[in-house]
Amino acid sequence: MKSFIFRQNPRKQQQEQNNLVDYSDSDDDEECNDDIFVNNEIIINVSEKSSKDYGLFIWDGSLVLSWYLFTLTKNNPQFWNGKNVLELNAGVALPSILLSKLGVNKIIITDRIDGFIEIQNNIIDNLNLNGFNINNNNNINDNKIFIEPLSWGNFEKFSNQLTSSSIDYLITSDCFYDNTKNYDDIFATWYYFLLKNDKLVILLTYQVRCNEKTIFNYLKKWKLKSEILSIKDISIPNYNIDSEIILIKITKNQ
């Protein structure tokens, strides 16, 4: 059993000088429930599965991205209201669940076609844990949340929901690995949505794993504008952010 609790509770800060993060591990449990306290009002429950599929775990990049998305509401609590958001490579979909709580107009949660059913079922479980009524027919909360298969560069298999929706923000975390064969497929997918909306903002958390092959040359190749965003002010209580995680904002050159 592994569990962690993130608290950011202003009313308790005077009583508790330190926020609590609990970590425990046990090989006996096939499933663990993580309670992530995003602020005083939002509690997110996430279930991880013991599986060979890496898409069923919470990764550091997903945590960093989630907390950054939350910080955007610090000065404007309505920041996400009316926005349409697409999450690629979602895994357990922590950022999407958070955004659903923060008032997005529509969230489309996607992951690869290969192994999609298992990932989809885990996402459905997590959405249900957080009070969203969802079933396998994607009949979810008045067409607010959708779960769709999407493999990088496989445009002919994009669902109607993907091809017809106007996306304001595209978010993704930890999609580049040492064994990622073709970075161009990822960039082609981003570019597809940038062509549909040239004001689209892509937010990416990227963990440097291979110094010989980084995304920055590809950003130049695809002529995309990028900005490294500071994560020093992202406050994940008592959580040590991996120094190799980079948060990048990507837009289309105008």
UniProtKB/Swiss-Prot annotation:
UniProt keyword list: Methyltransferase, S-adenosyl-L-methionine, Transferase
UniProt region (Disordered), positions on chain: 1-27
BP GO annotations: methylation
Molecular function GO terms recorded: protein methyltransferase activity
Top-level taxon of origin: Eukaryota
Biased composition (Polar residues): 11-21
SUPFAM superfamilies: S-adenosyl-L-methionine-dependent methyltransferases
A Pfam family recorded for this sequence: Methyltransf_16
GO cellular component, one term: cytoplasm
Alphabetical list of InterPro entries matching this protein: Methyltransf_16 (IPR019410), SAM-dependent_MTases_sf (IPR029063)
Family: Belongs to the methyltransferase superfamily. METTL23 family.
Function: Probable methyltransferase.
Record's protein name: Methyltransferase-like protein 23
The species this protein was found in: Dictyostelium discoideum
